[in-house]
Amino acid sequence: MSHFPWLTIIVVLPISAGSSIGFLPYRGNKAVRWYTICICILELLLTTYAFCYHFQLDDPLIQLEEDYNWINLFDFNWRLGIDGLSMGPVLLTGFITTLATLAAWPVTRDSRLFHFLMLAMYSGQIGSFSSRDLLLFFMMWELELIPIYLLLSLWGGKKRLYSATKFILYTAGGSIFLLMGVSGMGLYSSNEPTLNFETLTNQSYPVALEIIFYIGFFIAYAAKSPIIPLHTWLPDTHGEAHYSTCMLLAGILLKMGAYGLVRINMELLPHAHSIFSPWLMIIGAIQIIYAASTSPGQRNLKKRIAYSSVSHMGFITIGIGSITDTGLNGSILQIISHGFIGAALFFLAGTTYDRIRLVYLDEMGGIAILMPKMFMMFSSFSMASLALPGMSGFVAESVVFLGIITSPKYFLMPKILITFVMAIGMILTPIYSLSMSRQIFYGYKLFNVSNSYFVDSGPRELFILICILLPVIGIGIYPDFVLSLSVDKVEAILSSYFHR
């Protein structure tokens, strides 16, 4: 157990600092922007320092563990800890949130509330990934929903209230099942109710009850990830949200569902996961084909990118269902990879809209001539999204492929069928990705408009995009940079999984 409360500071700092925004002098928005960015940078530096100097990569056990009494009546403790499974998402959260704050620089209306909500969401997301208590996990899970709802409903597009309401109905509805599962697992004990992850890991349940718990948790994570058919809120939400909010949604929020699926369903409910893993593979394969087939029919640029996110989440679902070291590591790698790529694509879509004020692809064209820097960056991240070799998407999807092929749980024909479906999805991805680039950047529609003049990407925007592009290429060239964080923890999960 850590003697210094690193994780408590990391979790509490953003929302505490955000609460102080109201005390800043009213001298325009610049002070609020710089204050928020400095807090995000400080938080990221603290996280990096704590992990570099106080975390052992070869130790699969929980590290930097903290356990403080909170509510004795319910045996509810403030329990935090980090292992190889949660370290990557925590660092991703800090990185993407810092860049999203910088991306929100043009936001001037109610700037104080906007930046407070971003910092509050930061705390909720870090808390979710580092919680070691089921009730604390649920509280952090809910904490980040409120800021996102307000960011959508106050700073969104024309249909922002509809999309925000749809978002909260899906996610809050899923949270009801999450709360029921948390309550059921906590109360199922012969002695005292417990919500401690370590205790629950060694808890056994009747198969029927474990299946009920598994389904409840799965519905909550399926609504958040999203997994079909609970995905319909995502295109509407991305279509209306400000692009800085889209960066947080695509980069972090969607990954929380996949994280919960591994952390709780796979680690705490192994027998039920073994039963449902073939269905996860089937759902993931259908999701890849469905989203990749639906995406080309979307006229709205951000909705097309949103459907590509749904398709990529299918690879994560398949990797989790493969029940192999390789497949699960591939899913974790895809979580990190798509966090970068999705955030960058939505940032590019938003900055493009700021310039041309068009959202429909069939109205665009010829932007490459007018904005070559943006064209270069959009093309680079489109290549990363369609899994170009040398970029992170290719490595992640390839590792998931290997995980399915080497899985001892499935017969040869089901593995061939799933692999074939995934291959079709990988063929469809370049179709909608490259056609999207063609519709935006090629042709002469905007170039022939009288008095057409558009400003190319500025230094701030290029800085954000380069900061995201570097890890995408870095992971593509040296994937061990991410895999080294999780490989020992994945082995520990699966070794205990098969021997229980």
Curated annotation (Swiss-Prot):
Principal subcellular localization: plastid
Membrane topology of this protein: Multi-pass membrane protein
Cysteines engaged in disulfide bonds, as pairs: none
Single annotated GO MF: NADH dehydrogenase (ubiquinone) activity
Keywords per UniProt: Chloroplast, Membrane, NAD, NADP, Plastid, Plastoquinone, Quinone, Thylakoid, Translocase, Transmembrane, Transmembrane helix
Catalyzed chemical reaction(s): a plastoquinone + NADH + (n+1) H(+)(in) = a plastoquinol + NAD(+) + n H(+)(out); a plastoquinone + NADPH + (n+1) H(+)(in) = a plastoquinol + NADP(+) + n H(+)(out)
EC number: 7.1.1.-
Cell compartments where the protein resides: Plastid, Chloroplast thylakoid membrane
GO cellular component, one term: chloroplast thylakoid membrane
InterPro entries documented for this protein: NADH_Q_OxRdtase_chain4 (IPR022997), NADH_Q_OxRdtase_chainM/4 (IPR010227), NADH_UbQ_OxRdtase (IPR003918), ND/Mrp_TM (IPR001750)
Coiled coil: none
Transmembrane segment boundaries: 4-24, 37-57, 87-107, 113-130, 134-154, 167-187, 208-228, 242-262, 272-292, 305-325, 330-350, 386-406, 416-436, 462-482
GO biological process terms held by the UniProt record: ATP synthesis coupled electron transport; electron transport coupled proton transport
One Pfam family it belongs to: Proton_antipo_M
Keyword NADP: yes
Family: Belongs to the complex I subunit 4 family.
Alphabetized NCBIfam families for the sequence: NDH_I_M
PANTHER family the UniProt entry points to: NAD(P)H-QUINONE OXIDOREDUCTASE CHAIN 4, CHLOROPLASTIC, NADH-UBIQUINONE OXIDOREDUCTASE CHAIN 4
Name listed for the protein in its UniProt record: NAD(P)H-quinone oxidoreductase chain 4, chloroplastic
Organism: Illicium oligandrum (Star anise)
